[in-house]
UniProtKB/Swiss-Prot annotation:
Protein name: Polymerase acidic protein
Gene: PA
Recorded family membership: Belongs to the influenza viruses PA family.
EC numbers, comma separated: 3.1.-.-
PTM statement from Swiss-Prot or TrEMBL: Phosphorylated on serines and threonines by host kinases, including human casein kinase II.
Cofactor: Mn(2+)
Keyword Cell inner membrane assigned: no
Location of this chain's protein in the cell: Host cytoplasm; Host nucleus
Motif Nuclear localization signal 2 (NLS2), residue range(s) on this chain: 184-247
Task of the protein: Plays an essential role in viral RNA transcription and replication by forming the heterotrimeric polymerase complex together with PB1 and PB2 subunits. The complex transcribes viral mRNAs by using a unique mechanism called cap-snatching. It consists in the hijacking and cleavage of host capped pre-mRNAs. These short capped RNAs are then used as primers for viral mRNAs. The PB2 subunit is responsible for the binding of the 5' cap of cellular pre-mRNAs which are subsequently cleaved after 10-13 nucleotides by the PA subunit that carries the endonuclease activity.
Any single GO CC term annotated in Swiss-Prot or TrEMBL for this entry: host cell cytoplasm
Transmembrane segments: none
InterPro entries: INFV_PA (IPR037534), PA/PA-X (IPR001009), PA/PA-X_sf (IPR038372)
Length: 716
């Protein structure tokens, strides 16, 4: 066979084929059939291009004799046969000058008349099988495929054969001649049988035995064997006319594909109704801390000791009174509960030795606030299955709420920097591998950007409260334990600081299942007057409990100090996730890292340092009614972190549904922006699925309003 190849083909073609095989580590002397196949393919590519020119008028003409006077341009650019680097250079320059989409794999030719790349195939098997393999391999709508066989058959994309009859006849004749020459030397059978399919990564996986029988049984109707089903699936053109495909499906499926244009999408409908209220477990921007610097008191680190020490830093306590009642609650009970906390803290101080934990007396006000004896009595099903009118409680539909401005303010605050650091730079050992080195550099840069962020304070506060509450729920199931809400940080000067936000009193907590609820009463300090945005504090009873002297530019001013009290509840699973809120740092770091990776792959070097240190560059942060908001890389880090933290603090079924459903619409809009001409069916159904999640949750409503801003700007 090797001798035949050297005799039958032009020496230049033989040389190119040898070079190509060596590039892939193959030996022409051993893999002789492959050698012959490569030479054949090369020759057909050259023949395809031969004699085809474009004249001054841009018309395609055929010139067989070399007329030296004609100013002619070759119609085809030959890419096959060049070394890879050169071939890609040619492809890139064609794409740059013509604006044609760059193919993923190297094609064989470029046609300057039709402005498209061409993939030439020469097969010893059936043309349509080989065509499908090629199409599956290159997966590009834009590259034109033209297959020839040694038996004179051909197949091309959309039956558009590019060349005139005569030129194609020359190619078919040459292939027929090669086949006869091989046959006369007894080489054809071996050559014909040696052709493998297009080698894609997915090698055919043979199924035998029981699995094979199951596969044959579970074929869709009208398929006789797994093979012909496979062939059908391989040939299923996903971007072909979808209506045609649907008609092959079931008679029940009817979907009209509507083009999705700039004018198609409408904004999401946000609900009307009273303004939405705060529903997080802890207060955020309105929280006030009583703090001690450089704590060194006896029992430092024991929450109760720390709390008492923090309480003693404040001297403005006064007789508490209700300034904003809770609409549905028994407000005097909230007032009595706070007075009880003060009294019991005073009792502790009068004792010889302060205990490590404090269980509150089970007074009537606490029993009421913690829902003691309020749960309906559980009855065994056996005892009541004969009751004729046994039914589940009618539950009310949730009341719709409209978006209030406070939630955007909460988010803005969460992105801001505080004057304290809330996380330590983790002391992790020496890096062993270079990738670890890059990772720790990135981590250090990221930590520097977010360690002082208010969202990071919320993480540490959330972790502390959930851990303390879960511990107490397990350790003191029957007790009304008093749990201080504490956080720790470092000041600018590096001094340690312990902060008290208020207290929680836990109810009975026999938590068997993950979703069993433990009730608690939270009491949180604040300087925010609840009468400014009463709708935000709907679920709270607010007391005025003291006056605080604040240093301002004009000297000291006295401000009333408030206590926000409410009944709340949580479960084991929610506390478990709350304890793991530090994951938010990881999630936002990974998002930043993918931005760095994208930059690095464009520049072909690690861009970590430039990414964080180029202070002049701004990055898109999000969309507001004003347009696309931009900011420094630090601001991007903090915004991503705040989003992740709010997803945790405001986790809810409404958020789950909204995120999943709105993502689909987002992908369609992005496809439109990328000029991919998306089509949709039942867009109304998608809008319904998104909008049924827009009920009353402040964080979901804010995200929906951001989504509307995005739609407006994306479709301009």
């Amino acid at each position: 066979m090797e001798d035949f190849v050297r005799q039958c083909f032009n020496p230049m073609i033989v040389e190119l084929a040898e070079k190509a095989m060596k590039e892939y580590g193959e030996d022409p002397k051993i893999e002789t059939n492959k050698f012959a196949a490569i030479c054949t393919h090369l020759e057909i590519c050259f023949m395809y291009s031969d004699f085809h020119f474009i004249d001054e008028r841009g018309e395609s003409i055929i010139v067989e004799s070399g007329d030296p006077n004609a100013l002619l341009k070759h119609r085809f650019e030959i890419i096959e046969g060049r070394d890879r680097t050169m071939a890609w250079t040619v492809v890139n320059s064609i794409c740059n000058t013509t604006g044609v989409e760059k193919p993923k794999l190297l094609p064989d030719l470029y046609d300057y008349k039709e402005n498209r790349f061409i993939e030439i195939g020469v097969t010893r098997r059936e043309v349509h099988i080989y065509y499908l393999e090629k199409a599956n391999k290159i997966k590009s709508e834009k590259t034109h495929i033209h297959i020839f066989s040694f038996t004179g058959e051909e197949m091309a994309t959309k039956a558009d054969y590019t060349l005139d009859e005569e030129s194609r006849a020359r190619i078919k004749t040459r292939l027929f001649t090669i086949r006869q020459e091989m046959a006369s030397r007894g080489l054809w059978d071996s050559f014909r049988q040696s052709e493998r399919g297009e080698e894609t990564i997915e090698e055919r996986f043979e199924i035998t035995g029981t699995m094979r029988r199951l596969a044959d049984q579970s074929l869709p109707p009208n398929f006789s064997s797994l093979e012909n089903f496979r062939a059908y699936v391989d040939g299923f053109e996903p971007n072909g006319c979808i209506e045609g495909k649907l008609s092959q499906m079931s008679k029940e499926v009817n979907a009209r594909i509507e083009p999705f244009l700039k004018t198609t999408p409408r904004p999401l409908r946000l609900p009307d109704g009273p303004l939405c209220s705060q529903r997080s477990k802890v207060m955020m921007m309105d929280a006030l801390k009583l703090s001690i610097e450089d704590p060194s008191h006896e029992g430092e680190g024991i929450p109760l000791y720390d709390a008492i020490k923090c309480m003693k830093t404040f001297f403005g306590w006064k007789e508490p009174n209700i300034v904003k009642p809770h609409e549905k609650g028994i407000n005097p009970n909230y007032l009595l509960a706070w007075k009880q906390v003060l009294a019991e803290l005073q009792d502790i101080e009068n004792e010889e030795k302060i205990p490590r934990t404090k269980n509150m007396k089970k007074t009537s006000q606490l029993k009421w606030a913690l829902g003691e004896n309020m749960a309906p009595e559980k009855v065994d099903f056996e005892d009541c299955k004969d009751v004729s009118d046994l039914k589940q409680y009618d539950s009310d539909e949730p009341e719709s709420r409209s978006l209030a401005s406070w939630i955007q303010s909460e988010f803005n605050k969460a992105c801001e920097l505080t004057d304290s650091s809330w996380i330590e730079l983790d002391e992790i050992g020496e890096d062993i591998a270079p990738i670890e080195h890059i990772a720790s550099i990135r981590r250090n840069y990221f930590t520097a950007e977010v360690s002082h962020c208010r969202a990071t304070e919320y993480i540490m506060k959330g972790v502390y409260i959930n851990t303390a509450l879960l511990n107490a729920s397990c350790a003191a199931m029957d007790d009304f334990q008093l749990i201080p809400m504490i956080s720790k940080c470092r000041t600018k000067e590096g001094r340690r600081k312990t902060n008290l936000y208020g207290f929680i009193i836990k109810g009975r907590s026999h938590l068997r299942n993950d979703t069993d609820v433990v009730n608690f009463v939270s009491m949180e300090f604040s300087l925010t007057d609840p009468r400014l945005e009463p709708h935000k504090w709907e679920k709270y009873c607010v007391l005025e409990i003291g006056d605080m002297l604040l240093r301002t530019a004009i000297g000291q001013v006295s401000r009333p100090m408030f206590l926000y009290v409410r009944t709340n509840g949580t479960s084991k699973i929610k506390m478990k996730w709350g304890m793991e809120m530090r994951r938010c740092l990881l999630q936002s770091l990974q998002q930043i890292e993918s931005m760095i990776e994208a930059e690095s792959s464009v520049k072909e070097k690690d861009m970590t340092k430039e990414f964080f240190e180029n202070k002049s560059e701004t990055w898109p942060i999000g969309e507001s009614p004003k347009g696309v908001e931009e900011g420094s890389i630090g601001k991007v880090c903090r915004t991503l972190l705040a989003k992740s933290v709010f997803n945790s603090l405001y986790a809810s079924p409404q958020l789950e549904g909204f995120s999943a459903e709105s993502r689909k619409l987002l992908l369609i809009v992005q496809a439109l922006r990328d000029n991919l001409e998306p089509g949709t069916f039942d867009l109304g159904g998608l809008y319904e699925a998104i909008e049924e999640c827009l009920i009353n949750d402040p964080w979901v409503l804010l995200n929906a309003s951001w989504f509307n801003s995005f739609l407006t700007h994306a479709l301009k």
